[in-house]
């Protein structure tokens, strides 16, 4: 847009030449992806178990769900017969209240196959709150966790597990991607699990490991 305006100014003889000619934007440096070091994942999950949130964070590390998707899960989203989890909504905080919305893209609406261990943990945890519609109800309110609250718990788990790396909650998606690709799952499948339109993100992960 700026280049075109300057070209027009040259045409109208307002300036002698276009100063933007030959200018190149600096290459955008890709941020190095942070993940939980594989050798520390056991410590992280142990911390989650001691904190009483193992099912939630085990599911996160085995699916790479977005934070809002994780806290929006209902028990009706889990199909025990097909061992699948339907991801069709997300939670965000707006004007101090939790708001449930549909995903922004069609690719974000998806079914994910769960491992037997993930299902076992979820079913066992269900016994603690059998009448709640939420998969992970807040022990304080009985309602949904706020996404920010889950982020704070994640930080506590890192501290308890002695993980010094600066790993954001969102980086758990990178952790899942890394582990999935290293285990032989193709980037396209990983992208589908994550709810991405293409495998580009997964390929970036592959290039970084």
Feature roles, as predicted:
Residues 11, 54, 58, 62-69, ...:
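C-terminal catalytic core of tyrosine-transesterase DNA break-rejoin enzymes
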Residues 27, 35, 91, 194-209:
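Catalytic-site neighborhood detector that most strongly recognizes the C-terminal catalytic loop/helix
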Residues 72-78, 191-197, 207:
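A short, basic/aromatic helix-end/turn motif that makes direct DNA contacts
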Residues 89-107:
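Short, flexible, glycine-rich and Lys/Arg-enriched loop motifs at helix boundaries
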Residues 1-8, 114:
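Non-catalytic DNA-binding core/recognition domains of DNA-processing enzymes
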């Amino acid at each position: 847009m700026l280049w075109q305006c300057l070209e027009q100014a040259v045409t109208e003889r307002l300036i002698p030449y276009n100063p933007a000619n030959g200018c190149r934007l600096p290459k955008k440096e890709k941020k190095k992806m942070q993940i939980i070091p594989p050798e520390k994942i056991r410590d992280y999950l142990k911390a989650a178990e001691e904190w009483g949130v193992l099912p939630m964070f085990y599911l996160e590390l085995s699916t790479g769900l977005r934070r809002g998707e994780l806290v929006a899960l209902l028990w009706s989203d889990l199909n025990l017969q097909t061992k699948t989890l339907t991801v069709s909504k997300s939670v965000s905080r707006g004007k101090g209240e939790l708001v449930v919305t549909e995903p922004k893209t069609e690719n974000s609406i998806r079914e994910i196959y769960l491992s037997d261990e993930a299902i076992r943990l979820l079913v066992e945890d269900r016994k603690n709150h059998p009448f709640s519609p939420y998969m992970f109800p807040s022990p304080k309110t009985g309602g949904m966790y706020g996404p920010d609250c889950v982020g704070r718990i994640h930080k506590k788990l890192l501290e308890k597990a002695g993980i010094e790396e600066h790993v954001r909650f969102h980086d758990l998606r990178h952790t899942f991607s890394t582990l999935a690709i290293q285990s032989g799952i193709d980037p396209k499948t990983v992208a589908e699990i994550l709810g991405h339109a293409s495998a580009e993100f997964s390929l970036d992960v592959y290039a970084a490991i």
